[in-house]
Structure formats: C-alpha cells, structure tokens
Amino acid sequence: MLTERQLLIFRAIIDHFTWTIQPVGSKNLLKEKSLPYSSATIRNEMGVLEEYGFIEKTHSSSGRVPSEKGYRFYVDYLLQPKKLDKSDRQMIRSFFSENYYEMEGLIQNSALMLSDLTNYTSILLGPEATKNHLSGFRFVPINNFQAMLILITDQGHVDNHLVTIPEGTTLSDIERMVNILNERLVGLSLDDLKVQIPMEVKELLGKHVRNYESFMHVFSDSFAQASQQKVYFGGKTNILNQPEFHDINKVREMLHLMEEEQDVYELFRDIPDGLQVKIGRENNNSLMEDCSIITATYNIAGERVGGIVLLGPTRMEYSRMMGLVDVMSRDLTDVLTKLYRDNQN
C-alpha cells in the first residue's frame, strides 16, 4: 500500500510525535531525522499520507500528527512486540524469582511493577471469584467484640474480613461453628456457598450454636464480599499525568471511573485471548478517546483466569509496551500455575 519512502517518512512522524507530542512539518522532519530526501519530497509524501488518512493536521499548527487510522496501520503492519532490553528483563526476572505464597499479593505487585516500568496505568483483573473453591477458613477473635474471618481458596486467594462478634457468643460457640462450616463447605465454589449457607448450614448451626441467626448475617455478608471480582491497579493516576488529560472535567470523570472497581471489571472482562491493542475511539468509551489499551490474559494450569490491561496515550511506544505486557502475561501465568500446584500438594 505504501512505498518504502512513504513508510520511512511515516515511521519518522510516529517516532517524532511519540517523544515530542508536537506536530511536525517536512523541514523539521528532515532536520531531526536526517532523512535521505529533500524537504519538497517529504512534503509531497506527507500529502499522500494525509490523503490515506494516516496523518492529519491539527487546529493549532501547520504540522501533522498521526491519526487513529495511522496508528492502527502502524500497530497491525509495521511493528512486532519489542524484545525487552536488559534492564526491563532483569527487573521482571528479579520480581518473579521471589517466593510468593498467596495469589492476591502476587497479582497486586505485578500491577505495580508494570506501571513502574511503563509510567502508565496498569489494571489486572483477578480470577473470577465465584469459580474459586473454598479450601478452609478461620475465625480469629481479636477482642470480645471483633474477630477476623479468613477465607482461603484453592487458587491461593486469602480474603480477610473484620467482623463483629454477635452479643452473647462464646469461644466454644465459635469453635463449633468453624468446625461445622469447614466440614460442610470446604470444596464448594463461592457461588455455591450462597445457596448452601441459607439452606443446609443454617439448620446445623441452629442445632449446635447459640445466637446462630446473627452468625448467618456475618458469614453471608463476608462470602458475598469474597465473591466480588477483584481489580488490582498500578499507577492509578499515571494516565492523568499525560498532556492529553488537560481537561479538568475529563480528569474528574476518569478518577470516578477508577474508583468504581466493579465498573472497571465489567469494562475489561471480555478482553480476547492473546496480545491485543485498541486505539482511541475503538475503546467505545468517551473517556478513553485519547488512550490506547494493550491487553493480554493470564492462565492458571491451562485455564484462563484473568486479564492484564495497560492504559496509556495513543502516542505510546507501542513496540516496547506490547513486549512488556506479553512477557508479563507469560511470566505471571508460570508463577501462578506453580503457586496453584504447590497449594494442591
């Protein structure tokens, strides 16, 4: 579609805008990139690129910038995920060589590391909680009025809930209740727990535990919270530091979105397998018209369980960012699978 000369000039425009965020004309492009063409030739070829819709003129300058269509062509046909440089690879290798004993901390720290490497906002979608199976739980009294309810799933997820101990409850009541629940509920999915607690467990608790009605509310609320989908952020406000976000209303709306974790989960829950890039208006969200999103999924023991989202400006350094997300997906899969298998033994 494009000649070698047009491709070279187009790449130079992309590279210029990635690092300067400024429109560029033929004279500056020639001076900056030392292209082997005259200014007139570059100007003519830029005219062709504009006719194709790959670059466009801004309102405030006579120079040109890449368009969404141009970025789409660039990502689809002109680049591959970049092989990580030594410092990136070393940081990731060092991170994943640590010993991790629970899934939640590993995923959260992965989100933080990805944002540190990119200076963009990273979002990791946790495994679908309702498919997790209960491995066991503990009820640890803190004082006469409060206790910590600790739920552990088969995928290494640990959920802690500070709960109020119902009035008149004794330690022996708590011990009996924990034994009953562990006996009846271990191995069930969190989704099934919603059914089992009000049906079978309620009757058992009524026979063996005083004031069991209050316990029912405590456990029902805790299991409901544990069933919520988990979203882990790294650099939540990094995207707002980009020059594209100078509109205070857009900043406010984006901050509000980031605070609604379940909305964020629904926004990205259906990301496809493999490394994917959505650019600008392809995101079908007015808040993200100036953003590009790179996504990948991660697995545990061959089963897809979560997603990785990197949110940055449309002028991002795509090859490096795609390389980082791709490596993160594969390495996180390996470590989570090992953690899962260790927990099965």
UniProtKB/Swiss-Prot annotation:
Q: Which gene encodes it?
A: hrcA
Entry-linked HAMAP family: HrcA
Gene Ontology molecular function terms on file: DNA binding
A GO BP entry is: negative regulation of DNA-templated transcription
Q: Which family does it belong to?
A: Belongs to the HrcA family.
- State the SUPFAM superfamilies in the record: GAF domain-like, Winged helix' DNA-binding domain
What role does this protein play?
A: Negative regulator of class I heat shock genes (grpE-dnaK-dnaJ and groELS operons). Prevents heat-shock induction of these operons.
Protein name as annotated: Heat-inducible transcription repressor HrcA
* One protein family per Pfam: HrcA
Which InterPro entries does the annotation name?
GAF-like_dom_sf, HrcA, HrcA_C, WH-like_DNA-bd_sf, WH_DNA-bd_sf, WHTH_transcript_rep_HrcA_IDD
Task: Cite the entry's keywords alphabetically.
Answer: Repressor, Stress response, Transcription, Transcription regulation
